[in-house]
């Protein structure tokens, strides 16, 4: 069974914390948080690509 698209219990908890953080924000604040989160995800993708590209286990 492929579970790579499912969240772990820890990730589910983290998601609840994010929702609690977002609820009191106004639209502009929420949009800024979204942009920063997307930027962080893109940087994470770049790091993963770099590690895979430079891995000796290919």
UniProtKB/Swiss-Prot annotation:
Key words, A-Z: Chloroplast, Plastid
Pfam families: NblA
Domain of life: Eukaryota
One GO CC term, this protein: chloroplast
Major location category of this protein: plastid
Record-linked InterPro entries: NblA, NblA_sf
Compartment(s): Plastid, Chloroplast
Family as reported in the entry's similarity comment: Belongs to the ycf18/nblA family.
Protein name per UniProt: Uncharacterized protein ycf18
């Amino acid at each position: 069974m492929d579970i790579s698209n499912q969240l772990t219990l820890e990730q589910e908890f983290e998601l609840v914390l994010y929702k609690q953080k977002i609820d009191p924000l106004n639209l502009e604040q929420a949009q800024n948080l979204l942009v920063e989160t997307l930027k962080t995800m893109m940087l994470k993708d770049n790091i993963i690509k770099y590690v895979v590209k430079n891995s000796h286990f290919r």
